[in-house]
């Protein structure tokens, strides 16, 4: 796997889960002898929703909600076969979305 790079993008609503997952991925990759760049924090996406509380009148009565999507990027440079096997066997938290691309 010479001159290859594995790029891992992580997304989660809870920053504690995503930080724990990135630490686990980085530790696994370093243990198998690969060079790791990151984790790089990407911009957090904030979605805001405004909902009317009253079912009929009272336009001024509203609730506001916010969902934050935290993102991290990890580059694994020159991965070994051990690195790929270890990453495939890795069990991450259920609330973390993982996208892996080879380049």
Swiss-Prot record:
The keyword Aminoacyl-tRNA synthetase does not apply. GO terms for cellular component: ribonucleoprotein complex; ribosome. It holds the Pfam family Ribosomal_S10. GO terms for biological process: translation. The keyword Ribosomal protein applies. Keywords: Ribonucleoprotein, Ribosomal protein. Belongs to the universal ribosomal protein uS10 family. Part of the 30S ribosomal subunit. HAMAP family: Ribosomal_uS10. Involved in the binding of tRNA to the ribosomes. This is Small ribosomal subunit protein uS10. It comes from Vibrio campbellii (strain ATCC BAA-1116). The gene is rpsJ.
């Amino acid at each position: 796997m010479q001159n290859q790079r594995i790029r891992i993008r992580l997304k989660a609503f809870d920053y504690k889960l995503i930080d724990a997952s990135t630490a686990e991925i980085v530790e696994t990759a370093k243990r198998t002898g690969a060079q790791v760049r990151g984790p790089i924090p990407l911009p957090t996406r904030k979605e805001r929703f405004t909902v009317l509380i009253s079912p009929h009148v009272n336009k001024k009565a509203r609730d506001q909600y916010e969902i934050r999507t935290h993102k991290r990027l990890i580059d694994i440079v020159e991965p070994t076969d051990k690195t790929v096997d270890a990453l495939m066997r890795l069990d991450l938290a259920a609330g973390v979305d993982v996208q892996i691309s080879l380049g």
